Amino acid sequence: MSNLITAAQAKEFDIKKCLVHSNDGTTKSDIGVLITDLYYFEDLFSPTLKVDILFGDTGTVKEGGVFKNAVDALQMVGTEQVDLELIDPNDQKIKVTLYTDAIVPIAKENRKSLVSVTLGSKESIMNYKTTVNYRLDGRISDHITRILTETLKVDGKKKLDIEQTSWWKM
């Protein structure tokens, strides 16, 4: 049995696809070949994963017959869907859909720029952008279920594993 690699440099990932969809759904582009650095984070104490990518935006996205840089063509402002497929250093295929959280231009010149993008799950992004503005009475487990389904609108395909409140004085 071989030892698993638990930490790896970005160069060791084989990026198969990094397809970014614009928020209006009209434009999409695979920026996988533009990525210079990729940092993939999984944490035992975090309910979600996080990916940071750094890419050279060189005007390779065609929109309306004109080549534009990816940030402008996709109108990247946050919450864009990103379909990511890669193979990690342990030869495990990772296929995940994430959403853009932070888009930071690091360096910009005429027709080219260096951009840092932070990706996270839809729930983690919605968690920071949504507030609960109503009072809740009753069992804590019922509150969690209500917040996840009604306020955060967690996908119905995901199984909610919520431990029921065992003691509650009515």
Mark where each language-model region is.
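Assembly/oligomerization scaffold segments
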Residues: 1-131
